[in-house]
Amino acid sequence: MKSLFEQFEIDLYCIIITRFFDVSITTITVYLGLLMVIVIGMYKVSLYKATLIGNNNWQHIGEMIYEFVVDLILEQVGKPGILFFPFIMSLFLFVLTLNVMGLIPLSFTVTGQLLVTFTLAITIMIGITIWGFRIHGIKFLNIFVPSGIEPWLLPLLVFIEIMSYVLRPISLAVRLFANMLAGHLLIHIIGVAAIYLMQFYFIGILPWICVIAFMFLELGIAFLQAYVFVLLTLIYIANIINLH
């Protein structure tokens, strides 16, 4: 690659602009389409094989992910959180699959785009805020009022709580974006060094070993970042349900 950041450049394939929306097809659009095909295809294969031959590896993987997400919801939110299972399951698979897809050589890392992660984070926060007003009404605003505080401190703490709430989507988005960006840049740098050092025979093997090791590390980070993203989302949901 000519540039270190070339792998994060967004290509425009087709311009489609309607009266109200710009629905042009870009690299992000293509990879989101692939994401849907992969996730739906994986579960279709799992169900198809389960019908023909009973238990299979695909089914076991699906069940492991299902149980992992359910346990996470019960741990962070409790039984009321099961209502959010379809959303949390979809969110986890969305982030995890995009993270893993970005590890494929010469591919595009969708979660390495701040625009994508911020759009996802702000949509989540708007959605759970609307839900908070729906279940609590005007009492939802009590989430910004700490209990047991001296009256003269209340305005300052309410301001801090509001700012903390407003900044949540930014921290959620930047955390995922920064980790994926840094990891892929590191692999790129080590890969370029490995190609350069190949001319030194056995010395050139060492960087390639590092590349492979970092690829496995990035695979773990891909899962970890999906876990953290979903975990923080559940914590925010729990805060809204319990108003604290």
Swiss-Prot record:
InterPro entries: ATP_synth_F0_asu, ATP_synth_F0_asu_AS, ATP_synth_F0_asu_bact/mt, F0_ATP_A_sf
Chain segments annotated as transmembrane: 20-40, 81-101, 113-133, 140-160, 176-196, 202-222, 223-243
Cellular component annotations (GO), alphabetically ordered: mitochondrial inner membrane; proton-transporting ATP synthase complex
GO MF term list: proton-transporting ATP synthase activity, rotational mechanism
Family: Belongs to the ATPase A chain family.
Main location: mitochondrion
Residue ranges that the Swiss-Prot or TrEMBL entry lists as coiled coil: none
Pfam family of the protein (one): ATP-synt_A
Role summary: Mitochondrial membrane ATP synthase (F(1)F(0) ATP synthase or Complex V) produces ATP from ADP in the presence of a proton gradient across the membrane which is generated by electron transport complexes of the respiratory chain. F-type ATPases consist of two structural domains, F(1) - containing the extramembraneous catalytic core and F(0) - containing the membrane proton channel, linked together by a central stalk and a peripheral stalk. During catalysis, ATP synthesis in the catalytic domain of F(1) is coupled via a rotary mechanism of the central stalk subunits to proton translocation.
NCBIfam families per UniProt: ATP_synt_6_or_A, PRK05815.2-4
Organism: Dictyostelium citrinum (Slime mold)
Topology within the bilayer: Multi-pass membrane protein
Keywords: ATP synthesis, CF(0), Hydrogen ion transport, Ion transport, Membrane, Mitochondrion, Mitochondrion inner membrane, Transmembrane, Transmembrane helix, Transport
Localization annotation: Mitochondrion inner membrane
Subunit and interaction comment: F-type ATPases have 2 components, CF(1) - the catalytic core - and CF(0) - the membrane proton channel. CF(1) has five subunits: alpha(3), beta(3), gamma(1), delta(1), epsilon(1). CF(0) has three main subunits: a, b and c.
Official protein name in the record: ATP synthase subunit a
